[in-house]
Amino acid sequence: MKRFFIVILFILLVCIFNVKSEEQLGEIEISKNSFSIDTNAINAEINYVIDNSITKPKLIVTLLSGDVNSIEDITSISKDKSTLTFGDFSSLSLGNKQSNNNNRIVLMIATITGSLLFIRFNIGFNKSTTLIILIIGTIFLIGSSHSITLSEVSIRIDIKVPSTFKFEKLDLKLGSGSSNIIGLSSNSINIDSCLNLKDHKINLSDTTITSALNICSTKNIDIKNLKQSSNSLINLKTNSNITLNFGNGYSGLLDIYSNSLKIDEACDIKVDGLNTTGSCNEGTSSKLVINANGVTITGTTPTTTPTTTPTTTPTTTPTTTPTTTPTTTPTTTPTTTPTTTPTTTPTTTPTTTPTTTPTITPTTTPTTTPTTTPTDSCPTTSTWRPTMASSSSPSSPSFSSVTPILDFNFDKSNLGFRSRYKFNEKSISDGPNGIANSFSINFNETYSPDSNWLISKIPSPALRANVNYVFSFNFKLGQALSSDNTISSVTISFYSPIDLPDPNVLEYFDQPTASPLFTKTITTGSFSSSTTFQANSISIKPTTDIGLSLIAIQIIRTKQNSIPINLYFSEMKLSIPSKSIIDPTTFLTKDSELINIPKASASFDSQDPSTCPYLATDLVHWHDKSIWSSGIVPLPNASSNIILPAGKRVLISPCSISQTDIYKKITIPPTSELIFSDVNMTMHVQDIYVQGKFTMGTKECRYNAYINLIFHGTKTTSDTIATNFGSKGIAVASGGFISVQGKQYHNTWSKLSTTAWSGDSTIYIQDSVNWEVGQQVLITTSVYKDELYNQNEVLTIAAISGKKIQFTSALKYYHYGGQEYQAEVGLLSRRIVFQGDQSSSDPQQFGGHVLVSGEGQFSGLSLVRFGQKNIKGRYPLHYHLANNVQKSYISDCSVIDSYYRCYTIHGTNGVTLTRNVAFNAIGHCYYLEDGVEVDNTISYNLGAFVHTIGTPAAGYNQYGQDFLQSSDLTQPADSAAACYYITNAANSFIGNAASGGWSGFAFPNLPRPIGNHLSVSIVPSQFIAKVWEGNTAHSSGYYFEFGASIYVGGLLTYNDATGLLQYSSGRESRDTYLTGYNTSAAVWMRFNNTKVYLSNRGLSMWGERTEAVNLESHDSRRPASLFGEAWLSNAIVNGQSGNILSASVEYTRQGFQFYDTYVQTIISNIIFRNFIKYQNASSNEEDNRVIISMTHSSEFLPQGISVSKNITIQNTATSQFIGHNIPVNSTGSSRFFNFIDWDGSLTGKNVPTLIGSHEKFWQFDNTCSFNSDWNCYVCTKGTREIANVQFWVPGLISRDDAQNNDDSIGSISLFGDGITDRRSTRVIHTAGITGVSNSGWYLYLTDGTPTYMKIWLAQVIYNNYLFIAIPYPATTTFSVSSEYKYNSNYNFNFTQTSSASAVRSGDGKKYYFDGTHLFIKVINFRLNGTESFDRGGAKVYDVYWEFLIHITASNTIKPPVNGFFKGLTDTLPSSNL
């Protein structure tokens, strides 16, 4: 019995206390450069360790005390893998929990069973033993339950990184514990242990920062050997003591609040109570802010050059200012330190979805309840000024000599699952909890296919031939290995996107029909483990360069599954290896071969510091309570409207205001002015109303400080600023003035001077720039379909010198920089930033806005998360009904991640909009609103990545789609959003670039103005551009078959009855006049020096008058589509450039398509090159041909409407010169296709040449030969011209009842001139016969010849004729006459002559009937030889309205039946005529 109770006692101790020793819970890989750890709910000991045995950073979590079974019980990682939170998550890890409980239950059962056996054989059963058994069972049941008590849990977190690793941002939100951080390198570090006032001691040693260090702690802060850049910001707060030692010296400003202070003698300080301000070593850039009881600062004298990479624009903002300050910390928050200027752009390429979360984060979490009294330490004397910012740029470090390894990561978010059947949206899901970058493939149904595909949703990087790349992944089975889940092979392939199904759309898929660009299969991978992830890798070495492609991964199992199975993947990636950086030996010396693209002046704006507004002697300080009527400096709060004192010029300095709390509204009265100091500062605000003046720099005193205005407010349509001025922004009333002018960076954008490949970290541009380390740079796409395959990239400058830029990370994609065209490279960062607060802006796309109804001057300003989607008038930067301005401009600004437009000119004339950049905007970007805006200059701007609102306009024919104004589409033309939206062309457009958008430049047709100007009596679409010079557009036009990068089309109208706008996206022509009024001369809309590339149609205008002179088109489906009287001259049309991304069968290219009816088109002085045959073309029109026909219809028939002259064709097979299509179902437009090669340069005949279709009707003499490659007759033109007549037969053929019906009702044949064979073409119900003049045409109608017909001489040109023969029965008599509808002097009655020959040689007023045929010679007597469209030494003759020939026939012997003479023999007239 004694032995029994000893056993029981042991069991009790094990079950009750269940004590665990120190235990490693697991590892978590850190996959993001910006990472956040939140241990606020748990006691944590944090160590930062340099470990060069690893290549990637990771966390090791060790349990020191408490009851935790799995790392998954206490951790949760965000979906983007950037935030790790510690807490009680045991309810989310049911699998592990259940498994542990099961283990406990098994142990319990085993122990009870053992006890029963022990009792049975050693003691025997009785009442006492039964009770003991019950006690044992209860104890084990208690022990088998499992819950986590966080207060009892203590962990150690070891952050291990290789010595070369640098964080972009590291955030630590800490509870109790301690941190010992040694060797950390980061752009910014934010450590906050103040949130719950828990004690956490912080020690830092050998730490390097380049932007900001923010620490808040209730315990001591000990920092040794801190290395910081010359522009870093250091903010330390604690109830206890601070020891701070600098490893590279300290030069900069001080702002310290402390009970005691020991500081180096090299610092010049001023002590006012507990406040100490000043600077060390005359430094001004860095900023040191400390709140503490005791401070010791050593090493302030610089002794060495900082080793860190300097940055002037911190890429993050401090977030550690506690919402609850330590209990012993003074209530004054230092305010002379800005919270840092935020990154103005995404650190990664935006997705193709325009509503992605923008990338600028607010500097702090502001409150509307004031937490500070900012004015206590600010002098109020009139002469006092803070130390103003310097214009100096940080020195660039040396360039790295190698590129970093670049990994393309794949996971659930960017892969689509496809199979033959049995799959859905749940077939791919998140991977196991706690496993970074993992996903699961789920075969939830039995007998799922044994093969499936993972198809990438994002384009692959460009791959060079003969370079080794690695595709790798870790793999684990979800169930133990069996025949159900055995992997037989994994194949990695690269396909052209058009050869794969859309990975965003669920659809069944078996195998691609096309061959891959590259493929490789492995059959011997590590695919057997169900307990641990095993590494797999595949070496990839393409034999040719691979441009635009998608990765497709095929996974094949040995058989279909009989049970549900899961396959787990982690760390799937394609790696581009590191390589040495070797500077190219040659660079582009010009950006174009032919055209001239003007550039902005290379000079900087002249500066005169003596004029700086903060130097004025009549200023008063915001923080001077004596200027306020209440005698109190106004504090920020949720409801106040701070009205500046009337008649005062108020200077605002960092110490004047709270930089963390929100100012509800600031009003500047008409006689007042608000002037900002040129000092780094941040201000949170909702509304600013300017009736007087708002000044933040001037043209001659551009500010150098980092000034950050953050606008707050949830979505509303209320006017909280002022009536009609909306909410959340700055509004300048009529009569008001605003000037915001930051440091000038020039050029604001350039172009590549050599191609940049995926994996490159260094680029070379065409212009020297003064950009700075740490700034953000955009490189635009080099693909055709910008929105579908987003390859725009935003990177951070690591080093820079002149035209060479190196980034902190490698390029993901290929960016072309050949002679034909080059990707644009734009600077996004500015020192002055206006941004929408992310938390209130993102959810409903409701950012800030700036509206100016007075005069406004802006330069060096960045606007981020601005614009309010679908709210009219709420745009990022907007001149609003300012009429004629005299001194307003927007220069070298940037708009980034806009919710609605970029730069708007509305009811305002005389604005200069120049050298600006815009990126990632919803709706039209550069926007002329109502159609009355004229005399503005829009020059040297860049717009990129512009998104439509709603479904992009498409359509199945030339007329596109109709869109009606709605709450989801306030301006229906946003369905075709353009980089530049031009409702009135009467402005100057010089040197602008458009990348992406539905179109690059859109000229919608407005029959009258809209909006506020409905009553203005002009027709906006009748105006021509004042200047169009040197503009470029690319990567657009692809949503609509007839869309273009420069699109002059569409119709925007206002319905007076409904009060709604309507937009039709398709065909709409425009008449243009010299003054814009139809009482003046008709003029041509001219486009000079234009470049289009990667376009659907480069330039499209539906008519009526167009000239495009000096044009380059590269990699476009067609360079231009021009209607009406159109001239394209002096051009290079290049079917294929050196850009490997465009070398795809995604689309074919044609040099020019001649239209099919009623236009006049001349192309002259054109070089066509690189039209390479596409073997799988469905027709000649779809092949890569230089000239193609339009052959789709029998309703629209061509006349003589097309001429070419001085054509040069290079690197193109002769077979590709012309591509005439013969449809399977014949069409009239195909039969009558023709054009004149004016000088024979295109066909190579070198004499004027006539090209006609495949019909023998075009074989008019023995100079004609049929070219089987072209499907055309090619003839020496001689004295012949193209002629067109229309036979109008009542009830049979009518011009007014054109039909797309190609049924034959007869034929027309050549006769005379020695022709004995049939050279004919069919006649159909649609009126119109086109052929060669000065020839015999014989008309035969199958159902007989009518008693009456008209012949319209649409195109029988001056000094030309047609000799027409028509069969009639013998004894028929005739009345033949001519009629000119508009002048009876040309009306003649024909007389009968003696022979057919006499008719042909006669004056055109005679006829002859030989008993079988009526012969007439038709001449248009009205013509005088001036009826033509002439350009470039060539001409296209007019279609002339309405000269008619009437023929009336009667016969009493063989009378007609129902108006037709029947039974006539089809006999060709004599060949001798």
Swiss-Prot record:
Biased composition (Low complexity): 298-375, 390-400
Bias (Polar residues): 376-389
N-terminal signal peptide: 1-21
Major subcellular site: membrane
Positions of region (Disordered): 298-400
Glycan attachment points: 126, 203, 241, 275, 444, 637, 680, 1078, 1088, 1176, 1206, 1225, 1389, 1424
Record-annotated disulphide pairs: none
Pfam families: CEMIP_beta-hel (PF24606), G8 (PF10162)
TM regions (residue ranges): 105-125, 130-150
Subcellular location: Membrane
Topological relation to the membrane, as annotated: Multi-pass membrane protein
InterPro entries xrefs: CEMIP_beta-hel_dom (IPR055401), G8_domain (IPR019316), G8_domain-comF-like (IPR052334)
Domain of life: Eukaryota
Transmembrane helix recorded as keyword: yes
Record's keyword terms, sorted: Glycoprotein, Membrane, Signal, Transmembrane, Transmembrane helix
Residue intervals of the G8 domain: 626-754
A GO cellular-component term linked to this record: membrane
Family from the record: Belongs to the comF family.
The name this protein goes by in its record: G8 domain-containing protein DDB_G0286311
Source species of the chain: Dictyostelium discoideum
